[in-house]
Amino acid sequence: KEGYNVYVYSIGNFPTLRCMEQIRYDVAYHNLNVKIVSVGAGYAYGSLGASHHATEELGMMRTIPNMVICSPGDPVEAQVISTVSANYEGPMYLRLGKAGEVIVHQSLIENLKIGDLIPVIRKPNANKALLVSGSILDYAVNRIREFNDLSDVYSIPFVKPLNIEQLHELAIQYPDICVLEEHQKSCGVGSAIIEVINDMYSRSEIPYYPRIKRIAIDDKFYSVSGSQAYLRKLANLVL
């Protein structure tokens, strides 16, 4: 039947990499109202080996036209993004953790629009910004608080599109920006941010090009089984 808001769900790579051609032609090309939901982002299913390490699918999904991509940082973000997805007409990919993710936000997030970045920690004397995508957010927040680092922290619940106005403000405000993500460095969230800021600089929309550091997975497979924490450390996803 027509007219439904369709949700498709599976683990990590299986509703994305395995059926990429069908997503491209049958969903995105026709701009259909289909929401693709995966659980097990990054190394959440690390004990099951490389077949279940969802570490490349963001890069592939964000190259597909018409596709909105969400990667919530905690259950509060996941809740509001679920509502956003139900009200959105068109293809969307929701990249979730596994279960038991730590709640970072202590209150509901209101008026979230597609593409928005969410401030998590703001300091009056901050000289750096840490942009975090996905469920590694709680680790990042804890590390910043532990070391009393002078960084503001922002969650990136939407990988595509990105709020250009917000990124423009960040590029002007912070000379140093770090992007942390549980995904391959190539074609990930950090790449998307660099592309946007590079375009701003090439059009003389920002006075200087901020230093952008990416903490992400190198161009390799980790053919081992282990906990998510173990594999994150193995892949140098550390602050």
PLM-predicted stretches and their roles:
Residues K1-A129:
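Conserved thiamine diphosphate
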Residues Y45, G97-L239:
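Thiamine diphosphate
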